[in-house]
UniProtKB/Swiss-Prot annotation:
Subcellular location(s) of the protein: Cytoplasm
GO biological process, one term: positive regulation of proteasomal protein catabolic process
InterPro entries per UniProt: B30.2/SPRY_sf, Neuralized, NHR_dom, Znf_RING, Znf_RING/FYVE/PHD
Protein's name in the database: E3 ubiquitin-protein ligase NEURL3
Regulation: induction: Induced in lung during endotoxemia. By LPS and inflammatory cytokines in alveolar epithelial type II cells.
Species of the source: Mus musculus (Mouse)
Gene encoding the protein: Neurl3
Positions of RING-type zinc fingers: 197-236
Matches recorded under PANTHER family: NEURALIZED, NEURALIZED-LIKE PROTEIN 2
Root EC class: transferase
Keywords: Cytoplasm, Immunity, Innate immunity, Metal-binding, Transferase, Ubl conjugation pathway, Zinc, Zinc-finger
Membrane spanning residue stretches: none
């Protein structure tokens, strides 16, 4: 499945620019010639794509949402997998990364809040050495998506699901500044997304869903979620308790 990666040495190793793997794609995925853009042709599923090479702990995967399509529920999923796409037949890929691919392989992915995957938004995601999966949108603060990625013992490839309202995405160079729109103010809800509720974008996020620990919701929205589905909208874990907290901080790490 490829050589093991040493997190301690990753800073010194030159990295090939990320692109999408050319063969292991969902049944509805169309890639451009450079394998930097992935578009879902139709339906709302079968949009799984992988990076063409393993990704280091702490390495950022940056992408832009090119097209948003109304009429579906839910959007882009991002995460990491130990599944080597070079060993995967496209015809064997399931329709969804969550939960299908997660159940079939060592894969850890999460749904991004719909408000963060509008057309033009830049999404950056990564996993740190503790196995914590983070995502950041535009100039916003990091969101902790989950804390259970296994980073030791085998390489990890980035995996994305061009699902639902997300119709097309483009991989970007996270070290380049060309996609940072200088001079344009970032909407307040994005800058302080770690402090405002990611559902209503109005009230302060002051609750923590247990046991997953996600803390991006105000009390009113959290209790509506608990009553309606009892599942975290970010990681889909079962909610057993809604805890009210006075101060919320997530350790980003690298």
């Amino acid at each position: 499945m490829g050589s093991l990666l040493s997190p301690e040495a990753n800073a010194e190793v030159p990295r090939e620019a990320l692109s999408f793997h050319g063969n292991a794609t969902g049944a509805q995925v169309h890639l451009d010639d450079q394998r930097s853009t992935a578009r879902r042709r139709s339906t709302f599923h079968d949009g799984i794509v992988f990076s063409q090479r393993p990704v280091w702990p702490g390495e950022r995967v940056a992408l832009r949402v090119l097209r948003h399509e109304e009429g579906w529920c839910g959007g882009l999923r991002v995460g990491f997998t130990r599944l080597d796409p070079a060993q995967v037949a496209a015809s064997c890929l399931p329709p969804f990364v969550c939960p299908d691919l997660e159940e079939q392989s060592p894969t850890w992915a999460a749904l991004l809040p719909e408000g963060f995957v509008r057309a033009g938004n830049v999404v950056c995601f990564w996993v740190n050495r503790r196995g914590w999966l983070f995502a950041k949108v535009n100039a916003g603060r990091p969101l902790l998506l989950r804390k259970d990625v296994l980073v030791q013992g085998a390489p990890l490839w980035a995996v994305m699901d061009v699902y639902g309202t997300t119709k097309a995405i483009e991989l970007l160079d996270p070290k380049a500044n060309a996609w940072i729109r200088s001079g344009e103010p970032v909407p307040e809800s994005e800058v302080i997304s770690g402090e405002e509720c990611v559902i209503c974008f109005h009230n302060t996020a002051n609750t923590r869903l247990m046991p997953c620990g996600h803390s991006h919701f105000c009390g009113s929205c959290a209790w509506h979620i608990f009553k309606d589905t009892a599942r975290c909208p970010i990681c889909r874990w079962q909610i057993e308790e809604v805890a009210v907290v006075s101060s919320l901080k997530a350790e980003e790490g690298s």
